């Protein structure tokens, strides 16, 4: 599902108001379900999950839910198994494990969602890790780099010289 489609006359077109409204409705309902329900999946035990965005398909039958476990590290989500380097293992508590846990609970969550929201169809849910948190952290670290700060100061000095 594309975030932006192309319209021949006006260029890029984003999601419709209806898609945005339905996505927010589902996001709020899922947050309430995750907060109130006792989820039995071991991957979600003791972990708070943030649902940052829900993107709806044009027909509102599919929802992509972007999630981030609170307190998740930026460390790799998978590791190579020492005994078999070609086999990967999901790191406990990692975003990949949380997404896998939510995916296993999709049927349960969809059933609870059907009772909570008033829509003609309850959408199929797909969970993905939200990379924007990691991107923001990376940008913060990048701006703290002394070399980058030096370049920013140099550019601001050049801009001041051109003005005055």
From Swiss-Prot:
InterPro entries for the chain: KH_dom-like_a/b, RbfA, RbfA_dom_sf, Ribosome-bd_factorA_CS
Keywords: Cytoplasm, Ribosome biogenesis
Any Gene Ontology biological process: maturation of SSU-rRNA
GO molecular function annotations of the record: ribosomal small subunit binding
Keyword Mitochondrion tagged: no
Signal peptide: none
GO CC annotation, single: cytosol
Matches recorded under Pfam families: RBFA
Subcellular location: Cytoplasm
Subunit note: Monomer. Binds 30S ribosomal subunits, but not 50S ribosomal subunits or 70S ribosomes.
Family: Belongs to the RbfA family.
Purpose: One of several proteins that assist in the late maturation steps of the functional core of the 30S ribosomal subunit. Associates with free 30S ribosomal subunits (but not with 30S subunits that are part of 70S ribosomes or polysomes). Required for efficient processing of 16S rRNA. May interact with the 5'-terminal helix region of 16S rRNA.
Name of the protein in question: Ribosome-binding factor A
Organism in which the protein naturally occurs: Caulobacter sp. (strain K31)
Gene: rbfA
């Amino acid at each position: 599902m594309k975030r932006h489609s192309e319209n021949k006359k006006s260029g890029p077109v984003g999601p419709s108001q209806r898609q945005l409204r339905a996505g927010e409705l589902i996001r709020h309902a899922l947050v309430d379900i995750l907060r109130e329900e006792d989820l039995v999946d071991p991957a979600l035990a003791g972990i708070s999950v943030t649902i940052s965005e829900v993107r709806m398909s044009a027909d509102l039958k599919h929802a992509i839910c972007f999630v981030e476990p609170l307190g998740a590290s930026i460390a790799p989500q998978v590791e190579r198994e020492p005994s078999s380097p070609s086999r990967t293992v999901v790191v406990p508590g990692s975003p990949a494990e949380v997404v896998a846990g939510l995916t296993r609970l999709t049927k349960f969550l969809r059933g609870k969602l059907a009772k909570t929201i008033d829509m003609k169809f309850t959408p199929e849910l797909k969970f993905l890790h939200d990379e924007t948190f990691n991107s923001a952290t990376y940008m913060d670290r990048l701006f703290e780099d002394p070399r980058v700060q030096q370049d920013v100061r140099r550019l601001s000095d050049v801009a001041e010289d051109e003005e005055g």
